């Protein structure tokens, strides 16, 4: 068994693709519209689906908003240069929720940004070799 994907429901698929692909560096792996079901699925990631876990972005055509609730935490992405990544995101107008710095009660350097739908994305500084 292996983890294939995690799914996020999104209001504006183009805005979400812009965030995850253009700003976060993922690739659009596949996109398919389902007219009879009135939804579109887009799969994005850093690798092919058969090589690792990806994100499924689901856009339901007739839904204008979602209640995020408080059960879901965040998506985490490893980044090589967390300061440069946060600078680039800030310049692009992304909502940085937490500036880069050590996590509470630890030394791992993290930051948080919000995607267009309000999902939290944790950025984790990858160890330098």
Give, region by region, the residue ranges found by the protein language model.
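Short, low-complexity disordered segments enriched in Ser/Pro/Gly and basic
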Residues: 67-69
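Core segments of cupin and vicinal oxygen chelate
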Residues: 7-52
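Short, charged/polar surface micro-motifs in flexible loops or helix N-caps
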Residues: 47-51, 62-64, 82-83
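Short, charged/polar, Gly/Pro-enriched secondary-structure boundary elements
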Residues: 49-53, 118-121
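Exposed loop/turn and edge beta-strand positions of beta-sandwich/beta-sheet ligand-binding modules
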Residues: 38, 71, 107
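Vicinal oxygen chelate
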Residues: 2, 29-33, 42-43, 77, ...
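N-terminal beta-strand motif that seeds the catalytic metal site of vicinal oxygen chelate
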Residues: 1-17, 72-77, 124-129
């Amino acid at each position: 068994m292996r983890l294939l994907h995690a799914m996020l429901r999104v209001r504006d698929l183009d805005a979400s693709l812009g965030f995850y692909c253009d700003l976060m560096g993922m690739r659009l792996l596949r996109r398919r519209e389902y007219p009879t079901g009135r939804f579109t699925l887009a799969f994005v990631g850093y690798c092919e689906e058969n090589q690792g876990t990806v994100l499924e972005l689901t856009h339901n055509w007739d839904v204008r908003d979602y209640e995020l609730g408080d059960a879901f935490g965040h998506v985490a992405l490893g980044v090589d240069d967390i300061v440069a990544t946060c600078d680039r995101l800030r310049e692009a107008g992304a909502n940085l929720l937490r500036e880069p710095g050590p996590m509470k009660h630890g030394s791992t350097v993290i930051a948080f940004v919000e995607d267009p739908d309000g999902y939290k994305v944790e950025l984790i500084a990858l160890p330098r070799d």
